[in-house]
Amino acid sequence: ESVAILADQNTPRTERVNLPFLGEEARIPTSLARFALKTDSPILPVFLLREGPERFRLVALAPIEPGKYADSEAGLGDLTAEVAAAMETGITYAPAQWFWVHRRWRAKHQPRQLIPGAPPPPPWGGETRP
């Protein structure tokens, strides 16, 4: 049996760690690592690459074995870091195909204030909201 998990989704604060990701510290979900450690299931990182109209290629990286992290106190964070490195591999291979809608780097990158003394722009990006 297999389970597919989108490992780059945003999660609650208690279910993520801050790790280097694409050159900056980012919030990385620990849920995939928790699941793998709890079930002793290998993680198979896969990426679907668009090659043309209605044409895709599935790329699989080497499996990540959770067993080597099971007895470590830092195991959850270390396994999460290995998952993040696998995501980086797929993203940097075809960066134009990575679609991200969450603010992964939100802690570091706050909106710039364009006019000194003016309030920051609304979080939804519009001028006004009913």
What are these regions, as identified by a protein language model?
Residues E1-P130:
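Non-catalytic C-terminal accessory region of glycerolipid acyltransferases
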